[in-house]
Amino acid sequence: MIRIISRANSVTSSNEVNRLVTGQIPHD
């Protein structure tokens, strides 16, 4: 469970960084 949450957090962080850099809002 913890591994999945950590991995999900990593993906979310990457998406947020990409959104800030590209200025685009990724649709979930």
From Swiss-Prot:
Induction / repression: By iron depletion. Repressed by the ncRNA ryhB.
Function statement: Cotranscribed with fur, it is essential for fur translation. The fur ribosomal binding site (RBS) is occluded by the 5'-mRNA secondary structure, which is opened by uof translation.
Biological process according to GO: regulation of translation
Keywords: Leader peptide
Name the UniProt record assigns to this protein: fur leader peptide
